Amino acid sequence: ALSVGWGWTRSANVSGQNRVHANRIHTIATRMADTGGIYTLSAQPGTIVSENAIWGVAPGPWAHDKSHWSYIYLDEGSAYMVVRDNWCPDEKFQKNANGPGNLWENNGPGVSDTIRERSGLQEKYRYLRAE
């Protein structure tokens, strides 16, 4: 999972201009709940979350609320972000106490297969992946 941001404020702060792009995120949250494949906190002006592929989010059997997870989770105060063209098998997104200015476009299973296929490490860096 990827977590970006800090705090619970809708006010502009040092978090911002982040790029979460073309990641392949899977098989996560096996020992936790209240999470997302991509999870954000606080206002992050100029942040773009795009062209990621996320699947296999599965809270552990002990989780108090097994439905409290999302592929993309904009939590407390998340504001001024663009979330677009992210592939996941279902449209399961969480928006909790968000601030203004978030733009959601074209996220879910209808996103191009090309985006899903191109996500993750580029060919020249794939040797870094644990086998």
Where are these predicted regions, by residue range?
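Right-handed parallel beta-helix
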Residues: A1, V14-A29, P45-G60, A79-D90, ...
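Extracellular beta-strand/beta-solenoid scaffold signature
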Residues: A1-R10, M32-L41, H64-L74
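Active-site proximal loops enriched in glycine and acidic residues that flank catalytic Cys/His/Asp
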Residues: V4-W6, G36, S42, E76, ...
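Residue-identity detector for threonine
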Residues: T9, T27-T30, T35, T40, ...
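Short flexible/disordered coil segments
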Residues: V57-L74, E91-N96
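Intrinsic disorder/low-complexity signal
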Residues: L74-D75, R84, A130
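Surface beta-loop-beta hairpin patches that serve as ligand-binding interfaces in beta-rich domains
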Residues: L103-E131
